Amino acid sequence: EGIEETLRDVPADKVINAVPFYTRLWNETPKTDEERAEDQGTEAASYSMKVTSEALGMEEAAQRVSEAGATVTWDDTAKQNYAEWQGDNDSTYRIWLEDASSLEVKLGLMKDNNLAGTAAWKLGFETSDIWDLIQKYVN
């Protein structure tokens, strides 16, 4: 959708499709009594869960999923692999993985729309197979 909207105003040969080499691990934990008391009188009071996240590179993200014993499934809406598992203190972890499968979809959009190229961030967060994949679509 974003690419289509951009191409209404910008020529394809001027558009770069940026892709991430990291993802976020989301953690939802029920708020403590103290946290609920602090939230009184604010919009946050209507939410029973505290949500936090941390950025993970591709390898570390896959390792966390494996350590949790979580099942990975393809989220066809997000075009990413997804996993969810229960942690301590009634917490729920959720992660949409950036990996070769999700990046291939993004790189395919670049090629299908004749975009100028791709940019990626953050170097060092990718797995070694990603560079062969990028070369397949950029060259």
Residue ranges of model-derived segments:
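A general structural detector for well-ordered alpha-helical segments in enzyme core domains, enriched
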Residues: G2-T6, K106
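Loop/turn elements at helix/coil->beta-strand transitions in domains of secreted/extracellular proteins
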Residues: V10-I16, N113-T118
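Glycan-binding loop/region signatures in secreted carbohydrate-active enzymes
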Residues: K14, V19-L109, V138
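Active-site proximal loops enriched in glycine and acidic residues that flank catalytic Cys/His/Asp
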Residues: V19, K122-L123
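Aromatic-rich peripheral "rim/lid" segments of glycoside hydrolase catalytic domains that contact
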Residues: T77, L109-D112, L123-N139
